[in-house]
Curated annotation (Swiss-Prot):
UniProt-listed Pfam families: Glycolytic (PF00274)
Enzyme class: lyase
Keyword Lyase: yes
InterPro entries: Aldolase_TIM, FBA_I, FBA_I_Gram+-type
Reactions listed under catalytic activity: beta-D-fructose 1,6-bisphosphate = D-glyceraldehyde 3-phosphate + dihydroxyacetone phosphate
Cystine pairs: none
GO biological process: glycolytic process
Protein name, per record: Fructose-bisphosphate aldolase class 1
Name of the encoding gene: fda
Length: 296
């Protein structure tokens, strides 16, 4: 593990950019960016266009290590190059710590939750991540209802995979998302915090994780997790809130920083001039940084 990157993620001021939409969500990501489905005719063309979009973001002067601590990439992005370097190396040279989304999507909903689908060949993927200079990983589950046993199952699955990732020398970001429209959201979050704490308490002293959580309904509901010795950092997803709304509620939660995806790129468009594109990206970065660092 790279100690300098570890220290930056643990103590740095800033947030983590999530650029990891995968195959299933790519057409929507492109559409939001102003690229219509009739502009590409197969997956290869689609992934080339999305790589162009991500390259435009990553190479923008606004996108630098001053306010952005890390960036989460999709597997295809990790394997491609930006200006002649693998994406992870390009980011690292900019002072941005690279992470890789490793999950293969969500299983069907059962008992009010969606577990992760199995991740075949995870060991090979982690080997490749190490070769590409990736620091950590991210994997997502989804919680829709307050079912204590099912929530515990989600957390247990996440930590089981996390231990494999730690053994490979990488830092896992564990993401059990709570749906922002869940009717017992606050109660779900209390049960989730309890389940996560129990798993954290069982980690060895040299096993570190990060957490990516929905911004809690009860302010500072996750403070105990943020302060846990086995947790490097706790980051928040925007989860369907607008950027303004996400920033507003994030600002109230001490020690919680952003890891926004859609809320970061929502004002960017393929038709914008570079000047306009960079200005909109800078604006988004500045407001998300502010909500992550300057607490209410």
């Amino acid at each position: 593990m790279n100690q300098e990157q570890f220290d930056k993620i643990k103590n740095g001021k800033g947030f983590i950019a999530a650029l990891d939409q995968s195959g299933g969500s790519t057409p929507k990501a492109l559409k939001d960016y102003g690229v219509e489905e009739n502009e590409y005719s197969n997956d290869e063309e689609m992934f080339n266009l999305v790589h162009d979009m991500r390259t435009r973001i990553i190479t923008s002067p606004a996108f630098n290590g001053e306010k952005i601590l890390g960036a989460i990439l999709f597997e295809q992005t990790m394997d491609r190059e930006v200006e002649g370097k693998y994406t992870g190396s390009y980011l690292a040279d900019k002072g941005i710590v690279p992470f890789l989304k490793v999950d293969k999507g969500l299983a069907e909903e059962a008992d009010g939750v969606q577990l992760m689908k199995p991740i075949p060949d995870l060991d090979k993927l982690l080997d490749r991540a190490n070769e590409r200079g990736i620091f950590g990983t991210k994997m997502r589950s989804n919680i829709l209802e307050n079912n204590k046993e099912a929530i515990e199952k989600v957390v247990k699955q996440q930590f089981e995979v996390a231990k494999e990732i730690i053994a490979a020398g990488l830092v896992p970001i564990i993401e059990p998302e709570v749906n922002i429209n869940a009717k017992d959201k606050e109660a779900i979050e209390a049960n989730l915090a309890e389940a996560i704490k129990a798993e954290l308490d069982n980690l060895k002293k040299d096993q570190y994780v990060m957490l990516k959580l929905t911004i809690p309904t009860k302010v500072n509901a996750y403070s105990e997790l943020i302060e846990h010795p086995q947790v490097i950092r706790v980051v928040a997803l925007s989860g369907g809130y607008s950027r303004d709304e996400a920033n507003k509620i994030l600002k109230q939660n001490d020690g919680l920083i952003a890891s926004f995806s859609r809320a970061l790129v929502s004002d960017l468009n393929a038709q914008q001039s570079d000047a306009e594109f960079n200005e909109k990206l800078q604006e988004a970065i500045d407001t998300i940084f502010d909500a992550s660092v300057n607490k209410a």
